[in-house]
């Protein structure tokens, strides 16, 4: 995948072992993701260029609910609000007094937030997945199977069965690290969290 008979036999053996390991990793990740039907947390997000220079640092709060609902609020001074009702996404920029509304892309490779809030039952169709565990932390590395993606690699880390952080790396090596704190799972969430009300006088862009 990515001449003698012995080499061929060795390659086939390795392939079978890798497929078995990957299958176990997929099942474990799916189980960890699906057990949280709702999630709320604070987050801190740090973006670095390929050379490690800091480009941006933000904080905020997220609220997620399966299937496909999320509210991602970034604090001032770079305030933004992204809300999904499961069908469309509204992105509100208060500085510009502008809201952009577009159809929710259900592909996990295009909308990473859906890894935490969407349908992940077929996650292995979109990613090659490997895992490693140490000290109560499980790291899952997801590599998209297609090139039409927002990122080249994504890492999800769980501590004691709860999402702890994630990292995205794009095609030019830019890294986005997101650390979650105060995580609460499976607590009731108001439906209004996922319903965006367009502010009076706002510019509306439909995509």
UniProtKB/Swiss-Prot annotation:
Endpoints of the signal sequence: 1-21
Pfam family of the protein (one): LolA
One cellular component (GO) term of this entry: outer membrane-bounded periplasmic space
CDD domains: LolA
Compartment annotation: Periplasm
GO BP of this protein: lipoprotein localization to outer membrane; lipoprotein transport
Coarse class of the protein's main subcellular location: periplasm
SUPFAM superfamilies, A to Z: Prokaryotic lipoproteins and lipoprotein localization factors
PANTHER family: OUTER-MEMBRANE LIPOPROTEIN CARRIER PROTEIN (PTHR35869:SF1)
Function description: Participates in the translocation of lipoproteins from the inner membrane to the outer membrane. Only forms a complex with a lipoprotein if the residue after the N-terminal Cys is not an aspartate (The Asp acts as a targeting signal to indicate that the lipoprotein should stay in the inner membrane).
Protein name as annotated: Outer-membrane lipoprotein carrier protein
Lineage: Bacteria, Pseudomonadati, Pseudomonadota, Gammaproteobacteria, Pseudomonadales
Gene from which this protein is expressed: lolA
């Amino acid at each position: 995948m990515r001449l003698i008979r012995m080499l061929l036999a060795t390659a086939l053996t390795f392939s079978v072992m890798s497929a078995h390991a990957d299958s176990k990793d997929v099942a474990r990740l799916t189980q960890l993701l699906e057990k949280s039907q709702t999630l709320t947390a604070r987050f801190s997000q740090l973006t670095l260029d390929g050379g490690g220079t800091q480009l941006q640092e933000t904080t905020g709060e997220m609220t997620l609910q399966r299937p496909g609902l999320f509210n991602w609020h970034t604090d001032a001074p770079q305030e933004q609000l992204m809300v999904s009702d499961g069908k469309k996404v509204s992105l509100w920029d208060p500085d510009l007094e502008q809201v952009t509304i577009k159809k929710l892309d259900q592909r996990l490779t295009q909308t990473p937030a859906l890894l935490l809030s969407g349908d992940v039952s077929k996650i292995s169709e979109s990613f090659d997945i490997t895992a490693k565990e140490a000290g109560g932390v499980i790291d899952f590395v997801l590599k998209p199977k297609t090139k039409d993606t927002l990122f080249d690699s994504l890492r999800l880390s769980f501590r004691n069965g709860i999402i702890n952080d994630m990292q995205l790396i794009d095609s030019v090596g830019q890294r986005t690290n997101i650390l979650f704190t105060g995580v609460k799972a499976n607590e009731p969430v108001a439906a209004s969290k996922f319903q965006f009300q367009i502010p009076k006088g706002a510019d509306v862009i439909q995509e």
